[in-house]
């Protein structure tokens, strides 16, 4: 039995993990701005993560046998992760990273709605309230008001659609992980999905001729860092989450806020004070939804 971490320590660690996830997206934007393609970034990140997870499992002597009944479901989950990865990185390439991640934060809401639709959970007024509050905050963060809708949508629309597509895809992955794939070791499950993602995007990118690497050293550093940050964050979760209380995991919702800060520092991406307020409202509402669910 692993020793539990105190709530304060857990929150600090998860905020650091969230910052690493956010840094991965900021580094990805640097790679994109210097000629790297979305497909190349996904293949690099997925392959690196799969290798790290494979090493972790070897060191811990984790069985790598996949039950035959779950192989098809794992393949489907891998396809969904590939779609999610492509959609989210495409969004990051088009709009500020923090805003892309805020739209992606609708994923927990979609997961709850899917669980309700499938009869796995009972609708609750508290959850409805959290969802409405999150959407209000998102509208503020995107600066989408009736008088500015057309102008803002012309600038942000494509990125918002990509990010929402990522949220939809990952909501189905969440659902599969919570139900049909729940019996698998988390490391093996993540390794399989990540490996499928790497193979699919590599094959698709090769056929489409869209595996362009960054054209200069700055872009290559961005490509390397996005892989490092993601691998560190993902592997850390497997060590930290088993030692935390359910309520502490709400700190993972810090990722969009961290992305806004990092993008401001390293990319010069700025948003208005009202948009920052909207970001905090959205993150707070999603955290509320998660804590209430647990």
Where does each model-flagged region fall?
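Helix-helix packing/entry segments at the starts of transmembrane helices
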Residues: 43-44, 100-106, 176-199, 230-265
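Glycine-/small-residue-enriched transmembrane alpha-helix faces in small-molecule transporters
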Residues: 1-44, 79, 87, 149-179, ...
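Hydrophobic/aromatic residues within transmembrane alpha-helices
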Residues: 31, 41, 91, 117-119, ...
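Juxtamembrane helix-loop boundary signature in multi-pass membrane transporters
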Residues: 1-16, 108-168, 274, 280-294
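Transmembrane alpha-helices of multi-pass small-molecule transport proteins
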Residues: 9, 33-83, 110-114, 133, ...
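Membrane-interface helix-cap regions at the ends of transmembrane helices
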Residues: 30, 34, 49-67, 135-153, ...
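Specific transmembrane alpha-helical segments of multi-pass solute transporters/efflux pumps
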Residues: 20-25, 60-100, 104, 140, ...
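Specific alpha-helical transmembrane segments that line the substrate/conduction pathway
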Residues: 40-51, 81, 88-122, 166, ...
